[in-house]
C-alpha cells in the first residue's frame, strides 16, 4: 500500500478507521496509547501530497472520530426528545461534519503555508482546537489530551492543561507519521521522540500542591437518587422523587458535614418548593450540616436559571432571592437555550426543547460553607477548563464541585467521557473534585485526577468520603492556557520565519 500518495478511496477508508478507533482511547475504554495511532491518522491525512485527497481524507477521519465518539447524543433525542432514530443519527452525522470543519481548517493551514514540521503542526492544531472550543459557544469534547489522564504524561496537565497534553499527542503522532513518510530519517526521528518523552516524563518530578494539614478533612455525602429521566418531570412521580431525596438526606445528616445533591434535584421551580427548602435549612442547621442543592431558580425579573445554593448555614439562612447562589453560565445549545434567537425558535416545537434559560456571569463567588469554599460547575460547564481556572483564580476555593444529570444519555459512553473531563479539571487545578450525578457516575476525585471512590450507575445510594483540601497552586491554575498558547505562537512564528528564509534561498 502506498501511504505517501494513496488513492482517494484508500485514504478515506484508512482515515475513517483510524478516526473511529480514537474513541477507544477515551473512557470507559481508557486505552490511552490508541490516541497516538488515531492522531497519527489525522496528521497523515491532513498532510497528504494531493490537496483533494488530503481534504477528503481529513473529513473522513473526522466523521469516524466524532461520529463514533459522540454518537451518544442520539440517546437524548430518541428516548427523551421524541426524535425518530434515523433523524437522530443524521443529527450525529451533522454534528460530526461540523466538528470536522476545524480539522479541515487545520489541514488547509498546514498545506497553504507549508507548515508541516511536528512542533508547528501541534501548534496549528492547538489553534483550531481553541476555535472548536469557543465558536458558537464551543464544543471541546473529545480533546486528545483527556486520553492521557491515566498515562505517564498526565503531570503535564498542572502545567499546560488538557491542551498541553493534546499538543503532546499531536507532536509525537506527527513524528510517527514522519517515520512512515521519510523512513531514511527514522533514527533521527526516534531520537527526537525519545527526547520529547524524556522531558515530558520529567514533569512527574514537579509537585505544585500538597495536602493542607492545617485544614481538617471534610466529611461529605454525595447523593445519587437515580430518578429516571422519563419520570423526573412527571407530576405523578413528584412525591416519589421527594421521598427518595428526603430519605437519602435524612440518613446522611448526622454523619456528614456537607451533603451534595445533583443538578435540579427537585423537579420544580425553586419558588414552588420554598417550604421544603426552608425545612431542609432548619434540619441541616440543627445537625450542623450544610446541603448544596441544584435548583431551577426564577429571579425577580422572571429570568430562569439552572442554579445551585447552600442550605443549613446558621448565620445566613436560606432566603429565596437573597441567598448566595451559583447560576450556570455555560448553557447547552438546543438543550437549555436555542441559539440565534427567533431564527431557530421553530426547533422548539419540532424537537420538544425546554424553555430558554438565562445564563449567570462568567466569574461568580464561590459557594461558602463552614467547611470551605466550593468552585461550582453545573453539568456541561465542567468541560470548559478556562472557566473553572478563571473562577478558581478569583475564588481561591478549597474544592471543585460539579453537579449533573447524565440520565439524558442512558447507559451510553457519554457519562464516562463526562467524568473523565471532570477528573482533568481536578488535575489541572490541583484541587479535589466532588461530583454528584442523578443516575451516575457520582464520584470523589483526588487532586491528582484519580477517582478515590465512585458509585455504580443507576443505583440509588449515597457516596460518603472524608476529603482534604490542598495548598499551593499549579502553573495552569495561575496562568491558564496562556503557557501553551504562547508556546504554540512561538512555534508557528518560528515555522513561518524558517519558511520565509527558505524561500529567499
UniProtKB/Swiss-Prot annotation:
For this UniProt record, give its keywords in alphabetical order, as a comma-separated list. Acyltransferase, Cell inner membrane, Cell membrane, Membrane, Transferase, Transmembrane, Transmembrane helix
Which residues carry out catalysis? 263, 328, 379
Role summary: Catalyzes the phospholipid dependent N-acylation of the N-terminal cysteine of apolipoprotein, the last step in lipoprotein maturation.
Record Gene3D superfamilies: Carbon-nitrogen hydrolase (3.60.110.10)
UniProt-listed PANTHER family: APOLIPOPROTEIN N-ACYLTRANSFERASE
Compartments in which it is found: Cell inner membrane
Which EC numbers characterise this protein's activity in its record? 2.3.1.269
InterPro entries (alphabetical): Apolipo_AcylTrfase, C-N_Hydrolase, C-N_Hydrolase_sf, LNT_N
Give an example GO biological process.
lipoprotein biosynthetic process
- Metabolic or biological pathway: Protein modification; lipoprotein biosynthesis (N-acyl transfer)
Q: Name one GO molecular function term.
A: N-acyltransferase activity
What is the protein name given in its UniProt record?
Answer: Apolipoprotein N-acyltransferase
Q: Which organism is it from?
A: Haemophilus ducreyi (strain 35000HP / ATCC 700724)
Keyword Nucleus on this protein? no
One GO cellular-component annotation of the UniProt record comes to: plasma membrane
What the record says about family reads: Belongs to the CN hydrolase family. Apolipoprotein N-acyltransferase subfamily.
The domain of life is Bacteria
